[in-house]
């Protein structure tokens, strides 16, 4: 670590690093959301389904995020739990237009919340009710009701309506997450 890094750390100017898990069913928009949060010169032009997981980084005014973009395909979801201990926050993405798989999303969320590495931690949960641009998309309120988010009493959580392709609703969510993480670190 160089002199400038040490000085910045002492003065509180160095960005705090935080590990975030990005979870949700396949085709919910996880990778597209993460891509939109990166600087425009670092964004991928083509988004392909994630196999296993990928690691992406982006920064806000006060935090440096390392995001574990976990595949939502059924055969890879069992990998999620291997990263729970490392996560300091969770982004859970839901396809608001996929009413048929809302039950599966709820089952995966319940499994996550009841896992020993998550259950007793006060870890912030950010939900993106994604694909709001679709004509028959469920509202964020309806998604919240179907996932029974009101039953989450021991963790801070927030849900945002989003359109990952256009980037709508993403900054609101990341701002909330940043505030939660900063509050935990003080």
Swiss-Prot record:
Q: Name one GO biological process term.
A: melanosome transport
Membrane topology qualifier: Peripheral membrane protein
Pfam families membership: Arf (PF00025)
Tell me the residue numbers annotated for binding Mg(2+): 50
Query: Key word Transmembrane present in the record?
Result: no
Effect of a null allele:
Results in the cardinal features of Bardet-Biedl syndrome in zebrafish, including defects to the ciliated Kupffer's vesicle and delayed retrograde melanosome transport. Isoform 2 defects does not result in Kupffer vesicle or melanosome transport defects, but rather leads to impaired visual function and mislocalization of the photopigment green cone opsin. Isoform 2, but not isoform 1, is sufficient to rescue both the vision defect as well as green opsin localization in the retina.
Keyword line: Cell membrane, Cell projection, Cilium, Cilium biogenesis/degradation, Cytoplasm, Cytoskeleton, GTP-binding, Lipoprotein, Magnesium, Membrane, Metal-binding, Myristate, Nucleotide-binding, Sensory transduction, Vision
Q: Which PANTHER family match?
A: ADP RIBOSYLATION FACTOR-RELATED (PTHR11711)
What SMART domains does its record include? ARF, SAR
- Give compartment(s): Cell projection, Cilium membrane; Cytoplasm, Cytoskeleton, Cilium axoneme; Cytoplasm, Cytoskeleton, Cilium basal body
Q: Which InterPro entries match?
A: Arl6 (IPR041839), P-loop_NTPase (IPR027417), Small_GTP-bd (IPR005225), Small_GTPase_ARF (IPR024156), Small_GTPase_ARF/SAR (IPR006689)
Q: Where along the chain is GTP bound?
A: 24-31, 50, 69-73, 130-133, 164
Which PROSITE patterns does the record cross-reference, listed alphabetically?
Answer: ARF
Q: Report which gene this protein is encoded by.
A: arl6
Q: What's this protein's family per the entry?
A: Belongs to the small GTPase superfamily. Arf family.
Quote the residue positions with lipidation, kind N-myristoyl glycine.
2
The keyword Membrane is annotated on this UniProt entry: yes
The tissues in which it is expressed are:
Expressed in brain, heart and eye. Isoform 2 is expressed only in the retina.
What is known about what this protein does? Probably involved in membrane protein trafficking at the base of the ciliary organelle. May function in cilia biogenesis. Isoform 2 is required for proper retinal function and organization.
Q: Which GO terms fall under molecular function for this chain's record?
A: GTP binding; GTPase activity; metal ion binding
Q: Which organism is it from?
A: Danio rerio (Zebrafish)
Q: What is this protein called?
A: ADP-ribosylation factor-like protein 6
């Amino acid at each position: 670590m160089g002199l400038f890094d040490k000085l910045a750390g002492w003065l509180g100017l160095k960005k705090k690093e935080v590990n975030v898990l990005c979870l949700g069913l396949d085709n919910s928009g996880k990778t597209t959301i993460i891509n939109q949060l990166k600087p425009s010169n670092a964004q991928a032009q083509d988004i392909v389904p994630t196999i296993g997981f990928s690691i992406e980084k982006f920064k806000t005014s006060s935090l440096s995020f390392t995001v574990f973009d976990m595949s939502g395909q059924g055969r890879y979801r069992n990998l999620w739990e291997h990263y729970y201990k490392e996560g300091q926050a969770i982004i859970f993405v839901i396809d608001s237009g996929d009413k048929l798989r809302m039950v599966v999303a709820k089952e995966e969320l319940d499994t996550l919340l009841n896992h020993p590495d998550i259950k007793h931690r006060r870890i912030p949960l950010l939900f993106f009710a994604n694909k709001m641009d679709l004509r028959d998309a469920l509202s964020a309120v309806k998604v919240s009701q179907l996932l029974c988010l009101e039953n989450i009493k021991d963790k801070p959580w927030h849900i945002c309506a989003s359109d990952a392709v256009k980037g709508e609703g993403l900054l609101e969510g990341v701002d909330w997450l940043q505030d939660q993480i900063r509050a935990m670190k003080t």
